[in-house]
Design a protein with these regions (language model features):
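Catalytic loop of short-chain dehydrogenase/reductase
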Residues: 1-44, 64
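C-terminal helical subdomain
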Residues: 30, 45, 52-55, 60, ...
Length: 103
């Protein structure tokens, strides 16, 4: 499970934007995204698909709904999308809501 906080290119949650006061969180997500690319290359010849998924700003902490967090069920859709990719689906990418996010 990744986060837009681990992206240089995500205009909403990217490293240079939202989490600048808590950089460790974004840096750990950036490392996870790098591991995603490495493992996707390692398993390229297999049917295993390895992707990072950002569920978006999701209400997993009490009170975050008032900050505009989406319901957990909405965030889960991104995870299910990635888990159910067909054999010819993408691998080594970073996605939210089934759409690619820039690294």
């Amino acid at each position: 499970m990744s986060s837009g906080a681990g992206s240089f290119g995500d205009p909403t949650f990217g490293l240079a934007h939202h989490f600048s006061k808590v950089p460790v969180y974004g840096i750990t997500k950036l490392a996870l995204n790098g591991l995603t690319v490495k493992l996707a290359r390692q398993f390229k010849e297999s049917k295993i698909k390895i992707n990072s998924v950002d569920p978006g700003f999701t209400a997993t902490y009490p009170g975050t709904e008032t900050w505009g967090a989406r319901p957990v069920s909405e965030g889960a859709k991104s995870v299910l999308w990635a888990a159910l990719l067909p054999d010819d689906g993408p691998s080594g990418g970073f996605f939210r809501d089934g759409k690619k996010i820039d690294w």
